[in-house]
Every structure is written in C-alpha cells, then in structure tokens.
Regions:
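Extreme N-terminal starter segment of soluble prokaryotic enzymes
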Residues: 1-6
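Short polar catalytic/cofactor-binding loops
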Residues: 8-13
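Cys-nucleophile CN-hydrolase/nitrilase-fold catalytic domain and related Cys-dependent amidase chemistry
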Residues: 16, 24-103, 172-192
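Short, acidic/polar
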Residues: 18-29, 148-155
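Structural motif
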Residues: 36-37, 140, 163-164
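CN hydrolase (nitrilase-like) catalytic-core segments centered on the catalytic cysteine
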Residues: 64-80, 149-231
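Short beta-strand scaffold segments in enzyme catalytic cores
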Residues: 81-83, 96-100, 131, 212-214, ...
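Active-site catalytic loop in hydrolytic enzyme cores
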Residues: 89-160, 173-175, 179-181, 238-252
C-alpha cells in the first residue's frame, strides 16, 4: 500500500522554532495513519514573509531542523518542508527552498525554479528544471507554488519518470480556481498523480484558500480539504484503487 499526504499547516510568521513544533505534531499524527510521505506548503517553516527571508535562511544541518530530520528517521516517513535557503551564487538573494528529509536520514534540497512576479525582489530562482527523488518508493518530482503555473515544469517531471508531482504552495482564494484546474490537468493529461499542500491560514498578506488536494492519474480528485484550517489530506492506494480522507490536525 502507498500512503501520502499534504500537511495543510498554519505558520507563525518568522518563528521557526514554533513552526518546527507544529510540524512535528503533524508528522506524528501522520505516522499514526501510516503516511509514508508528508509534504508541507511553500515556506511552511517561516510563513510567506518576504521581508524576513534573508534572516531566516536554513541549511539541513542547522540545529533547529534536527527534530524534523530525526522524526523522518524514527517514523520512516519522508518529509518535504518549505524554508528560505542559501542561493546558488554567493551574494545573491536567498532561494525559496524545499528541504527533503528522508526516512534514511539523508537530506536533499530543491530550489524553486520559477518565481512569482515580484518575488525577484527578495529571492533568487533555482536552476533545476526538474528534481525527482524516490520518496515513499515512488519517483516524485518536487514543485514550489509558481513552478506549477509553467506547464514545461510538469512536462519535465513526466519526462524524468515522475509518478507523483508534489507541490508546496501559497494559493489565495482568488487564485485557487485557476491553479487547481491546472493541477488537475496535469493529472489528466500527463497521467501523473498530483499532491498539493496549501497554507491553512493567511500568510504574508495572502488569504490562503486551504483546500489542499490530491488528484489521481487521469484527473479524478480523490480528496481535498474542505477549506482553511490545519489538517492532513491523506491519499492511499491499495490494489490499484485510491482512497482519501481528511484528518484534523492536533491542537497546538
């Protein structure tokens, strides 16, 4: 059986310590439901806070992230968390990163390839056209928010052999309809499964829509959060059939 989930989390602006603790609570809750891969939203560990990003850059070995790396090992669950990271070139603005903490203790980094208009004022873009890793036993391509608005990004994921297109996002109420139709289209037209984790509350001035979701290959939406709030959006496949459920996140 395969079991993956989007963590629809709520970030405390700029408070990495507090956000690590809330992430840990969601990881432990996901473990109780047999989740093998848990994906958090864009910049989940800091909130979407452009003016704070330069002071919140984190590397995989920073002590504040150690509890998450240990949780990945102890639960046997791969985690994808969002955080500002060092740029590729010294002196550049920080990149918008997704740290992957594997069940084997390894860490890997994906930098957001396509910036949203205006993000160039505080962030630098990555250069990887595709980043595919074996997570929960499945070739998984990572995406961060605006990456998903570029069809060539999803196509590159398919061409690289991805089974799952996993994206951490900041999607507002106003943008949700367009973005979700595009994600559904990738599942329908490219035959990949698509998992999207959105913030469950406002962040960085955006009234996030929540409604994190999963689409199976072919485009059927298996499960989606009904709205905002912290929750786990879980999709599982057994004997070729997908099922979904939404689990309320533990109180902090």
């Amino acid at each position: 059986m395969l079991c993956i989930a989007a963590a629809q989390s709520i970030s405390v602006p700029g408070d990495v310590q507090a956000n690590v603790q809330s992430h840990l609570s969601m990881v432990l809750a996901a473990a109780r439901h047999g989740v093998q891969l848990l994906v958090f939203p864009e910049l989940s560990l800091t909130g979407y806070e452009p003016t704070l990003a330069a002071g919140l850059v984190l590397g995989a070995d920073d002590a504040v992230l150690a509890p998450l790396r240990e949780a990945a090992r102890s639960t046997g669950m791969a985690l994808v968390v969002g955080v500002p990271v060092a740029p590729l070139a010294a002196g550049d603005k920080p990149a918008i990163g997704a740290w992957v903490f594997g069940a084997d203790g390894a860490a890997a980094l994906y930098r957001k390839r396509y910036l949203h208009p205006g993000e160039e004022q505080f962030a630098s873009a990555g250069v990887e056209d595709v980043h595919v890793r074996l997570l929960a036993g499945q070739p998984t391509a990572l995406a961060v928010c605006a990456d998903t608005t570029h069809p060539e990004h999803a196509r590159a994921a398919l061409d690289a052999g991805a089974f799952l297109y996993a994206c951490g996002s900041v999607i507002s109420e106003g943008g949700y309809a367009k973005d979700s139709v595009q994600l559904k289209g990738y599942a329908a037209d490219l035959g990949m499964s698509v998992l999207m984790a959105n913030h469950g509350a406002p962040t960085g001035g955006y009234a996030c829509a929540g409604r994190s979701a999963f689409w199976a290959p072919g485009g059927a939406q298996v499960v989606a959060a009904p709205g905002v709030g912290a929750c786990l959006v879980i999709a599982s496949r057994e004997d070729g059939a997908w099922q979904g459920r939404v689990v309320e996140a533990p109180a902090q």
